[in-house]
Amino acid sequence: MSDIQTLSFEEAMRELEATVGKLETGEATLEDSIALYERGAALRAHCETRLREAEERVEKITLAANGQPSGTEPAEGL
């Protein structure tokens, strides 16, 4: 398992889906299930953060006088 902070949104979503699948089978031991749940919660939080950052970037797109995108304005913290 890789460090969650280094994962792209798509990588984190794939891992989260796989984690949920493992939990849904019910075949993991209790300890493994707890570890999977904890990692899944961290993956979910990472995905939410990446989505929020993307939303902020989209909101910062600047428009020219004709209404066409003319560039971007960096969002704070990015």
From Swiss-Prot:
UniProt keyword GTP-binding, yes or no: no
Parts forming coiled coils: none
Reactions the enzyme catalyzes: Exonucleolytic cleavage in either 5'- to 3'- or 3'- to 5'-direction to yield nucleoside 5'-phosphates
Annotated compartments: Cytoplasm
Residues spanning the membrane: none
Gene Ontology cellular-component annotations: cytosol; exodeoxyribonuclease VII complex
UniProt KW keywords: Cytoplasm, Exonuclease, Hydrolase, Nuclease
Function: Bidirectionally degrades single-stranded DNA into large acid-insoluble oligonucleotides, which are then degraded further into small acid-soluble oligonucleotides.
Binding partners and assembly: Heterooligomer composed of large and small subunits.
Protein name: Exodeoxyribonuclease 7 small subunit
